[in-house]
Amino acid sequence: MTAALIVIDMQRDFCAPGGYADQAGLDISLLRAPIPAIQDLLAAARARGVLVLHTREGHRPDLSDLPEPKRRRAENAGAPIGSQGPLGKLLVRGECGHDLIDELQPLPGEPVIDKPGYSAFAATDLELLLRNRGITELIITGVTTEVCVHSTLRSAVDLGYACTL
């Protein structure tokens, strides 16, 4: 099998009440809308033996990996990264909001890629995991299509992967 499914950022901070997106004033019902379709896609991929990977956007507890422009954008949106929210510190690794949503939990053995930025390839070992498994084709799904999904897609295309969104 040369294909892999990457599920981008289906975490509480984006898809649950009290998370980062909710605190920033986004309509989380729109972010939750694709969950049933992603569940179907996951089931189909798993049934066919396709490698499934999950990503989570988040930062170190000390925010040492948070670039200043991203910090300012989040602050201007009304949801400063690292500030306390109902699900813990917003977009911080190890907090409740950083966890993947219950509906889309990884199975044992499915890699979870923690990323500090928008692309799942930036500052992660994703490319190494894919190359070591002979993956050449990617199916990419998830939330914040215009941000993290597209950033990952563009990086993947630049790295020579055939991609389906």
Where are these regions (language model features)?
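Internal catalytic-core helix/loop-beta-alpha segment
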Residues: 90-139
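Active-site acidic carboxylates
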Residues: 1-107
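Hydrophobic/aromatic ligand-binding patch that stacks against planar heteroaromatic rings
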Residues: 44, 103, 129, 155-157
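Glycine-centered short loops/turns at secondary-structure junctions
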Residues: 47-50, 134, 160
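Glycine-rich anion-binding loop/nest that anchors nucleotide
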Residues: 137-148
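Hydrophobic beta-strand scaffold residues
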Residues: 52, 163-165
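Short Gly/Thr/Asp-enriched flexible loops that form oxyanion-binding sites at enzyme active sites
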Residues: 149-159
